[in-house]
Each structure stands twice: as structure tokens, then as C-alpha cells.
From Swiss-Prot:
Pfam families: RecR_C, RecR_HhH, RecR_ZnF, Toprim_4. Gene3D superfamilies: 3.30.60.80, 3.40.1360.10, 6.10.250.240, RecR Domain 1. Belongs to the RecR family. This is Recombination protein RecR. A zinc finger (C4-type) spans 56-71. Keywords: DNA damage, DNA recombination, DNA repair, Metal-binding, Zinc, Zinc-finger. It comes from the Bacteria. The gene is recR. It comes from Tropheryma whipplei (strain TW08/27).
Length: 198
């Protein structure tokens, strides 16, 4: 077996999402066997990210300022908001270069099994953004799984009385998958062919 401190490193690396025991071991060995790897720089960068990155006060995306680069960009279409579950979904949609509006990050999806209800998400903040009357369309871009569909249905129902056009991504995205893993072409076509709910 390994010395205790190496076991600790493998265990801590294994806590990261997508890093299983073998990947954690591989990363730990890489760090130990490559003295040229700047571990201090990695540590400083991790500390900086933790201290400097916050949630945008407008949309909930990651930001270094109170407002993220998308919300503060005057070239964005301020009449359309794309509602996503997580900041990683913003990245996936931005890669398509098919959407020029704003975003709203919910911070998850409705999941009664996991004890996550509408009040646990940034839905109230979304409704506050919609209340001023400048938004003409909401694009629901939640994951095509049960939780994402339940979340999209709930939001569409809540918004229905506001006279705002509500659309959702077109089919073509595999059911049960995450937006993050969809390729740019598929996601771009889903945006182009979005279907209006009301």
C-alpha cells in the first residue's frame, strides 16, 4: 500500500466529480513523478478561484464581478432569457454561438427524491427578472431527463400568466442526458428548432 500522505491525496482527489479511485491514483502519481509540475501554481489557482469567483447577482452564472460578462455585455439580446440548470450549461450553449440573449441559472432541478423543490432553486429571482416587462421570450434549456422536464413544466406553468413567450429546446437531445455532454451541432440545432409552449 501507499504511505499515509499519498493515500490522503488519492482520497481527496477522489472527492472531485468524475474522478474515481483509479483516476485519483493516476493524478497523484503524476504529481509525485513529475517534479517540473508546478503544484504551487495549481494550489494558488485553486485558492484564487475559491476567493474570487462568485455567482452573478443578475443571472446566477459564475463571475469575478457582481455582474457576469454576459449580463454586462450590451450586445446581448435583453428580451430573451435562456433558463438553464447549472453554469456548465451556459458554457455548452455559448459554444454553439446560436444564442445571443441572456441566461438565468437555476442552481439545479426540481427533484422530490433528492428533496429539491422549487423554493430551493433560483426561480423566485427569475420571476423578479421577468416582472419588469422587458423580457419577451424565455427559452427553457433544462436537461432532457425527468428532473429537467419537471422543472421546465413547472416554470412554464408559473410564467403562463405573464404573457411571455415560452419555448424549450427542440428534440434531438438524448433523453436522460445532460446538456453539458451534447455536441455543439446538436445543441445548436435544438436551439434553432426550439418549440413554443404557449
Amino acid at each position: 500500500m501507499y504511505v499515509r500522505i499519498v493515500q490522503d491525496l488519492i482520497r481527496e482527489l477522489g472527492k472531485l466529480p468524475g474522478i474515481g479511485p483509479k483516476s485519483a491514483q493516476r493524478i497523484a502519481f503524476f504529481i509525485l513523478q513529475n517534479p517540473s509540475f508546478d503544484i504551487d501554481r495549481l494550489s494558488e489557482t485553486l485558492q484564487s478561484v475559491r476567493k474570487q469567483v462568485q455567482f452573478c447577482k443578475v443571472c446566477g452564472n459564475f463571475s469575478e464581478e457582481d455582474e457576469c460578462v454576459i449580463c454586462s455585455d450590451p450586445r446581448r439580446d435583453r428580451g430573451v432569457i435562456c433558463v438553464v440548470e447549472e453554469p456548465k450549461d451556459v458554457v455548452a450553449i455559448e459554444k454553439t454561438r446560436e444564442f445571443s440573449g441572456l441566461y438565468h441559472v437555476l442552481g439545479g432541478a426540481i427533484s422530490p427524491i433528492d428533496g429539491v423543490g422549487p423554493d430551493d432553486l433560483n426561480i423566485r429571482q427569475l420571476l423578479q427578472r421577468l416582472a419588469d416587462g422587458t423580457i419577451t421570450e424565455v427559452v427553457l434549456a433544462t436537461d432532457p431527463n425527468m428532473e429537467g422536464e419537471a422543472t421546465a413544466s413547472y416554470i412554464a406553468r408559473v410564467i403562463s400568466a405573464m404573457r411571455i413567450r415560452v419555448s424549450k429546446l427542440a428534440s434531438g437531445l438524448p433523453v436522460g442526458s445532460d446538456l453539458e455532454y451534447a455536441d455543439e451541432i446538436t445543441l445548436g440545432r435544438a436551439l434553432e428548432g426550439r418549440q413554443y409552449i404557449n
